[in-house]
């Protein structure tokens, strides 16, 4: 499964916002410069993140964007789905509002899709990894090794 640059750049944008001390607003120009990303593309991404309630904006000379919630409360599945839409390992997959995964190939023949089990497991693994990773973890991981906080339960 490949994610597009929307997910990659959007996660990098969110990490940059998470690095800011005191949750002060950050301009998209500053993020574009820090991450070497195209400003026009970031404008498109931040609109999706704002619509999803993950970032807020402040107008004015010292305005910009900031996280709408603490980094510890933002999971990567929220970020990726805000940018990419529902996560599906194959184009033939779609999820019902009840969360049931359906395969369009199952309609073509009078039997269950032969590979649905495999792709459902792939989707579940990806979703668990994204849901189990917070923005705070990525912010901490992005720091130089000597500045990182020890992980909970690790030897100091």
Where are these regions (language model features)?
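Non-DNA-binding regulatory cores of transcription-related proteins
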Residues: 70-156
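Beta-hairpin "wing" of winged helix-turn-helix
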Residues: 54-62, 66-68
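Short amphipathic alpha-helical elements of helix-turn-helix/winged-helix folds
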Residues: 13-20, 82
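Short alpha-helical segments that sit at the start of domains
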Residues: 1-14
